[in-house]
Amino acid sequence: IEFFA
């Protein structure tokens, strides 16, 4: 899970 990638 990536946030602001």
UniProtKB/Swiss-Prot annotation:
GO CC annotation terms, alphabetical: extracellular region
UniProt keyword terms in alphabetical order: Amphibian defense peptide, Secreted
Record keyword Transferase present: no
GO biological process annotation, one example: defense response
Cellular localisation: Secreted
Tissue: Expressed by the skin dorsal glands.
Function: Shows neither neuropeptide activity nor antibiotic activity.
Protein name: Rubellidin-2.1
